[in-house]
Design a protein with these regions (language model features):
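Short alpha-helical transmembrane segments in multi-pass integral membrane proteins
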Residues: 1-15, 69-136, 182-239, 295-360, ...
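N-terminal transmembrane alpha-helices
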Residues: 3-31, 35-36, 52-64, 68, ...
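Transmembrane helical elements of multi-pass membrane transporters/channels
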Residues: 10-29, 130, 141, 164, ...
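Residue-level hotspots within pore-lining transmembrane alpha-helices
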Residues: 17, 21, 25, 54-58, ...
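Interfacial/gating helices of multi-pass transporter permease domains
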Residues: 33-52, 119-123, 187-188, 229-237, ...
Length: 442
């Protein structure tokens, strides 16, 4: 095995497994809650849509942390790497508090934005109030994981996720259905299981982080002031990502609101496909993380030729992997939707939606690697903001509204049309990649 493949595997495989395990949090909840009927499926799905905003926002903080830590590690500047971690943790704590206040204090108002079904609102409010407390441990896990990957300890977040998923599965079984003497709690039981699992995940990552520091002989530095860059430069990197990711996730919520107004059956069909979509993307997300770390380190060393070469290899690997995974999804889409105790028409709609997703999967994965890893590794995040904003609000949302309210299409047609904006993203990203203007050493 070449040095390139060893480095890629060391980062990509643990990150991929971790992403798939994290996606399984949602799958386990959905399948078990699916035994309780369509209303509860939709309620948990709507929480997932709202939490997507937090996930992408805190993910953007973790992305900037990864960009800086990778480059400063490549440049052998430990102080700046620690400063990057400290500032990112502070940002993560502030964002977590804001989302906790929103989801924990105003769940009914949030749910009314998604659906007019009072049953879904009632079930969703119960779920929101409990799981809202998971935001802080999620932020801690995300940012510490960025450090561990850049320091070649990507296996730590994976093992933490494995323990958390095991806990989530067991607690779901006990609390949702009332096994081994526990009272059945339904959707609230799933919420408790998810919260406890996220707390366990962050605790295990924190312990692993401490062990790795000791093994590496590294000592924490509490600086909050950069020497190589300014806080304004940090803000200049994080704000475009925050804005673009927030607008993208807001767009996802607009799309979900459109799905919700297409009827409960359509919303349930879309919701039951979300976990498997997350799992498929997670199966190849390690390549995006590896691209950010590997290319970022090369840029930190000012080895621009090696950075471009590694980026191309990772893109090719992602394309081959996406085609293979998409083919499997087409074959087993019906088997997956059959796991849910819902009406046959909901299962049929879900199967077709998964096939449409599979057709777009190679484009989605290449966008993930390019936009989420390669192009951002140089720190110029503004161009990604422009691409994402135009793609979501200039193409995706208008097409979604046109298909749903203008053409009166069903869920399959609406989803298929709006997803064409992924093609625009890829075309523009490839042009920027080939021009090499993204290759910047901080």
């Amino acid at each position: 095995m070449s040095d390139f493949m060893k480095s890629l595997s060391k980062i990509a495989i643990p990150v991929t497994l971790q992403s798939m395990l994290q996606a399984s949090f949602s799958i386990i909840d959905q399948i078990m809650i699916g035994q309780l009927g369509e209303v509860n499926i939709a309620a948990v799905g709507l929480y997932g849509n709202f939490s997507l905003i937090f996930s992408v926002v805190i993910g953007s903080v973790g992305t900037v942390a990864g960009i800086l830590i990778a480059q400063f590690t490549g440049a052998d500047n430990e102080r700046e790497a620690w400063c990057s971690l400290n500032v990112s943790l502070l940002c993560g704590a502030l964002l977590s508090a804001l989302f906790l206040l929103a989801a924990g204090g105003f769940p009914a108002q949030i749910l009314q934005l998604y659906t007019a079904d009072g049953r879904i609102q009632q079930a969703g409010a119960v779920y929101f109030k409990t799981v809202a407390f998971a935001y802080l441990p999620m932020a801690l896990s995300t940012i510490l994981s960025a450090w561990l990957r850049c320091k070649e300890h990507a296996a730590v977040p994976f093992w933490a996720s494995l323990g958390a998923v095991a806990a989530n599965t067991g607690l779901n079984y006990l609390r949702i259905f009332g096994k081994l003497g526990f009272a059945p709690m339904g959707v609230q039981g799933a919420a408790i299981a998810t919260l406890v699992s996220q707390l366990l995940n962050s605790l295990l990552i924190l312990l692993g982080f401490a062990v790795c520091l000791r093994r590496d002989g590294s000592h924490p530095q509490w600086a909050l002031h950069f020497e190589r860059i300014t806080l304004w430069a940090y803000g200049g990197m994080i704000l475009p990502i925050l804005l673009s990711e927030f607008l993208w996730s807001l767009g996802q919520n607009v799309e979900s609101a459109v799905y919700g107004h297409l009827g409960t059956a359509n919303l349930a069909a879309y919701t039951l496909t979300c976990p498997i979509q997350s799992l498929i993307v997670g199966a190849l997300s390690g390549l995006s993380a590896a691209a950010g770390v590997m290319v970022g380190k090369q840029l930190g060393k000012k080895a621009f030729g090696d950075a471009y070469r590694d980026a191309r290899r990772i893109m090719l690997t992602g394309l081959v992997g996406a085609i293979g995974v998409a083919s499997l999804l087409v074959l087993f889409a019906g088997a997956y939707t059959g796991l849910y105790r819902v009406d046959a028409d909901v299962q049929a709609l879900g199967k077709v939606l998964l096939v449409v997703f599979a057709l777009y999967a190679p484009v989605k994965v290449e966008n993930m690697i390019l936009s989420g890893g390669i192009l951002r590794s140089g720190g110029n995040t503004r161009v990604i903001m422009i691409i994402d904003t135009i793609g979501t609000w200039g193409i995706g949302i208008p097409l979604c509204l046109l298909a749903a309210y203008g053409l009166q299409w069903g869920i399959v047609g609406v989803y298929a049309l709006l997803t064409t904006e992924e093609i625009f993203r890829l075309a523009v990203s490839l042009v920027i990649f080939k021009r090499r203007s993204w290759m910047i050493s901080l």
